[in-house]
Structures are given as C-alpha cells and as structure tokens.
Amino acid sequence: MPTAVHAPYDSAELAHAADVMVTDQMWVKPGHNVLITADTATDPVGVEAVLRAITRAGAKGGVFTIPQLPFQGMLADPYVPESLGAAVVKSDAWIDLTFPYLAGSHIHDEALKGGRTRYLLALDIGAGGIVRLYGRGDLDKIYAVQSALDALLVKARGKTCRITTELGTDVTCVLDKPGYIKPRRANKPGLYSPPGGSVLFPVVESVKGTIVVEAAFHEYYAIFDKPCVLTVDGRIRKVSGGGPERKVMERALRRAGGGEFGYVIHFTHGMHPAARMTHTSFEEATRVAGNDAIGLGTPFWMPGGGENHPDGLMSMQSVWVDGVRIVRDGDIVGPPKLAKLAAALTPVYR
C-alpha cells in the first residue's frame, strides 16, 4: 500500500466538513446535548472543528478526553471512567473519536439501550479525514451506492461469495443476514459510522481459504512489513508472515477469540472517492475504494463476542456473488445499475 500525497485544506473547508458530519449525518439540532469523546492521541484540530460545528448548530456540546485505551469494546471496560458513563446516557448525539474505540463497551451498550443516543463510531479520522470523508464526497451519491450494494447483499443471503486479491487472497463463504444496516442519516437512536463502506456478513463457519492482509488494527493501526496470511477453514487455523507484527496479531486474535484465533466475522468494501491511505487513520483506510476491513475473532452474537475484535486490511479486492463478479480490482462493475452509480462517484473539488 503506497503512501498517498494529500492536498492541503484550509479552515473554511474543515468547518464545512465538520458541519456536514454534525448537522447532515448526525442530525444535530438546536438544543441537543452532544458529546465528543477523545483520547490523548486524538487529533485536537479535528476535535475543535467538530465542537465548533456543534455550537454553530445551536446545540450544547462538550468534550470528554480520556487516556488512550489499550483495547477496544468490552475489553476497554476496566479502563473507562465511570463518570463517562453518566455523560453518554444523557447525550442526544455522541461522536466517538477515541482509538481504540468505545463501541461495544459497557457504557456504549447502556447508552444505546437507553433509546436516546445516536452514536457515531468515527475512530481516528482526524481533521484531514473529516475533510476528505465529509467535505470532499457527495454523501447523497455515496449512500446511493452504499445502499444499493447493501440491498444486493441482503438479497444474496445464502449465496456463495468469493473474494480475491493480487497478493494471494482467495476465500469463499456463504453470505448471512446482515448484522446491521448503515442509513444515510442518524435521525434515530443507534450506531452509525462514516460514509463510504458496505459490510458483507458471512456464515462464520462457512469461511474457507486464504486471506492476505497488508495492515491491521490489532492493538493499534499497523502497516505490515510483509503481508500476513490467515488460513481459514471455518475457524482461523493458522497465521503466518506479517513480520514483527504477527505476534501482536496473534495475541489480539487469541484475546478476542477466547484463547483461539476465532472466526472471520465480516468483510467490507470501501467506496469513498476521496478517502486516502494516509497510514495514520485506520478508519479512513477502510473507506478507500476497493479496501476490505476483515473483522476477526468472535462475533457479537456468540458468548464473549462484541466490538473487541481485530481487523485485517487488504486492498484492490475482486468480489463474486453467486458466480457473478460485482467488484474487479477494487471497482464495482456489476450489476449494471449499481456499476453506473459507482462510476459516478468522484471527489468534490472546492
């Protein structure tokens, strides 16, 4: 994955992008209580931009900064201040810029059970990521593609899916019922994520083949010196390659899998026309066109599962569903209606 060159942005562009995040996607209205969670590694420029956007929306915003967590999800519970739990349940909208993140933790679950909070799992996107994901993409067009691909995957439940890459990935699975959907706007309580990615949920026991990842979020976001190879036959049976990061990957897999390597929980497909491989943001990397963030470990519907799994990352994937190619080397090529929508995606130049 080569390092990309990025255009600079000015304060006006950042302000516009933060407004899109806050008022367009997260549906923040005057009088709403909005919480930003950040950690000691979060980009402060991005945090301030989002806070200012909340103020411009006429809402009441605040920032709760914690030390960077060692793990995400329920594994973060011992490290999360109780006072933060009191704040999230009183929030109409919660924008989480921590990484590792709070989704799947006890306070996150309590907030969603309360039926009030709209939660954005924004992770580590920073100011530059906010500009690219929210300011340099037409969200209506992006969600048109995302929703069409999601609908295709819903209809394909029970069909065989095959995914390959030039680096050697060749894996098949049976598609399962989607675990969740990603609506255009956060106008109801629940979990939301930045635009530009669809999720493919396999029947976990059906996944078979070889997965070659170039990067991962295990305990942190790491680019591998050498590709890491996962051999899968129902469960993940073997991990090889990966250079010095392999030990961290194996440790994270066993932690999330209850001592075993666990399963492949999900595949994804990135489609955001302005997302870039910065090597500083895992979340933005998952939105790059053709990238696939592969969830590994134990799914949330099994004991001990949840948002505590590591993710592998691979690029330029090709995807077949029921023998029909829908993605070629990262580009959506079918069916014709979906391919036409995808071909219209271009960055917004300001």
Stretches found by the model and what they are:
Residues 38, 213-215, 232, 240-243, ...:
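Active-site proximal loops enriched in glycine and acidic residues that flank catalytic Cys/His/Asp
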Residues 279-349:
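Internal helix-turn-beta structural module
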